[in-house]
């Protein structure tokens, strides 16, 4: 259903992109571009509040939610498929937009709390309404998104504007009725989960029982019931008695997709811990520890920084775990703890530039990674608005670029290649020419179709597979 919602964020009709994840050599992705830009982008002024900080499809893929640094959530709805226009089958339009979080100030600690949306997670749809969790650094909120196309009329004690009428002026008794109205999408906060995290929240994950979820910060992971806001259970606590002895922090956490007692969390030291809540209430002792031994020949000043895991994801079956560190994506088998079964180099050509990346703080960027619906393809972002895709079966990979400069309606996205040294071909880009201010940190893949969403700073691109 086309939405008739006022676009309060200025996210309007720019372009939208379309892509195919068949990792062929030449014609790979088509782009029916309609990416969404903020008004400031059109004037070539980028505001930090407009930078997209998270992207997430719902369980059916019909809705796509984005959060930004300004604390806003924008939800896009997929257009109904039109047989006469098959190229528009992956088109999404603005469905609802609302302010999820506001900036706050902690007077006890004299700290500002940013409104930036760190994560969004959808709950499975149970009725006509949609529910999602959004979080900033300190507070998680449960939102209900619902449609309304009727309004009540004919109140006895209220006039048409909702003002209370003088009972003395009421001369007849009316029966209220429902009248049709233009479709309106409402977002209302149903729960607010706060005051449980001392440090910044980096992850939220909904459990497979759909009754609980967990939130993770730098040193602790808490378990919540979706119906209870004033109490949570601490299930992981790695804070040492003496903070000077702190050697690592929690970077990401996720529940197993099917086993409600099992979850994993990653650390800044490059380790992944699998925990079972049935073993103890406080999961300080992990069930399994996944860690790859470091090659002494590759040891450097930056080794610990680039080994920090920025994202961890179970595959759909729950058999494998995917992790992303600064230079690589790794796939781990739950039955093999000592090394990953697959390692993919995302941008190994940056290894010689780690010193300059450290100086400009880019080495601390946190890239996410996603599976496709069948777990056969992996996607993650890079610099220069590049994103990488790896086919696990054919072992082929491709680098693609999300940018307005090379976007035309239903154009074909050509693979890009980075040249490290020597003579550069016409279609290659030198590693020295990469723009490190243009980075793709956040991506999402439709749960069942070849449709992906890519956030490039304050632009959102949506790609679908090529339509002949």
Curated annotation (Swiss-Prot):
Gene3D superfamilies: YVTN repeat-like/Quinoprotein amine dehydrogenase
GO molecular function annotation: protein phosphatase regulator activity
Subcellular location: Cytoplasm; Cytoplasm, Cytoskeleton; Membrane
WD repeat positions: 47-86, 112-153, 196-234, 245-285, 304-342, 359-400, 435-468
Classification via InterPro entries: PP2A_PR55 (IPR000009), PP2A_PR55_CS (IPR018067), WD40/YVTN_repeat-like_dom_sf (IPR015943), WD40_repeat_dom_sf (IPR036322), WD40_rpt (IPR001680)
Gene Ontology cellular-component terms listed: cytoskeleton; cytosol; membrane; protein phosphatase type 2A complex
PROSITE patterns referenced in this protein's UniProt entry, alphabetically: PR55_1 (PS01024), PR55_2 (PS01025), WD_REPEATS_1 (PS00678)
Keywords associated with the record: Cytoplasm, Cytoskeleton, Membrane, Repeat, WD repeat
Family: Belongs to the phosphatase 2A regulatory subunit B family.
Function: The B regulatory subunit might modulate substrate selectivity and catalytic activity, and might also direct the localization of the catalytic enzyme to a particular subcellular compartment. Negatively controls the initiation of oocyte maturation.
Subunit annotation: PP2A consists of a common heterodimeric core enzyme, composed of a 36 kDa catalytic subunit (subunit C) and a 65 kDa constant regulatory subunit (PR65 or subunit A), that associates with a variety of regulatory subunits.
Record's protein name: Serine/threonine-protein phosphatase 2A 55 kDa regulatory subunit B beta isoform
Species whose genome carries this gene: Xenopus laevis
Gene that this polypeptide is encoded by: ppp2r2b
